[in-house]
């Protein structure tokens, strides 16, 4: 009964044919990936803990059995989460033509990963703005027949269309998919914005 499946099931089936990795992905998986901001929206509406901040974390982010105990005890903290936008992690820097607008869409990231889609969050205001902007961008992807199966591609286009929606943080070592575990814990880490994403 997921919103992203009920609303866009036919689109996901079409986009499965566009996916160069369709042997390991399914239309249903695309819908789950796209549903993350809706899950956050639902959590905000319920808000059982009366919190001002929300954080999405894919369950696969904690698959390392040797994870630092400080992370396990404190993740996620809010000290690096903005109130009026979300925090996103880069895994590679933006390149010169990444912000090229084609068919009203910023960038084309079907064959490259620049940001992490599985760990992000922020204040209520930021998360709600993000949820709407993400779905607007997703609909544009569908309208322009741009592959939308990978949420981080749509996320990056969403951000590039409106950089005020997020802060993009840079891990000290590029291509660290799990850096936000460290940054949003009680480890002594200084947050650094990825300057290549400052538009």
Pin down the residues of each PLM region.
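GT-A fold catalytic core of metal-dependent nucleotide-sugar glycosyltransferases
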Residues: 34-90
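Short amphipathic alpha-helical segments, especially helix-boundary/capping motifs
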Residues: 13-18, 103-105, 128-132
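Short aromatic-enriched loop/helix-cap "lid" or pocket-rim segments at secondary-structure transitions
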Residues: 6-9, 67-70, 100-101
């Amino acid at each position: 009964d997921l919103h992203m499946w009920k609303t866009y099931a036919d689109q996901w089936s079409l986009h499965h044919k566009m996916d160069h990795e369709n042997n390991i992905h399914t239309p249903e998986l695309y819908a789950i990936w796209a549903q993350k901001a809706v899950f956050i929206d639902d959590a905000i509406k319920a808000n059982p803990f009366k919190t001002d901040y929300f954080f999405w974390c894919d369950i696969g982010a904690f698959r390392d059995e040797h994870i630092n105990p400080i992370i396990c005890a404190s993740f996620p903290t809010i000290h690096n989460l903005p109130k009026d936008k979300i925090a996103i992690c880069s895994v590679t820097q933006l390149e010169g033509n990444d912000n090229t607008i084609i068919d009203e869409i910023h960038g084309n990231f079907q064959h490259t990963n620049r940001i992490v889609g599985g760990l992000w969050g922020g204040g209520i205001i930021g998360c709600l703005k993000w949820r709407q902007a993400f779905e607007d961008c997703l609909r544009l992807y569908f309208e322009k027949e741009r592959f939308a199966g990978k949420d981080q591609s749509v996320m990056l286009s969403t951000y590039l269309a409106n950089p005020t929606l997020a802060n993009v943080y840079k891990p000290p070592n590029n291509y660290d998919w799990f850096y936000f575990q460290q940054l949003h814990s009680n480890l002594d880490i200084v947050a650094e914005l990825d300057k290549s994403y400052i538009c």
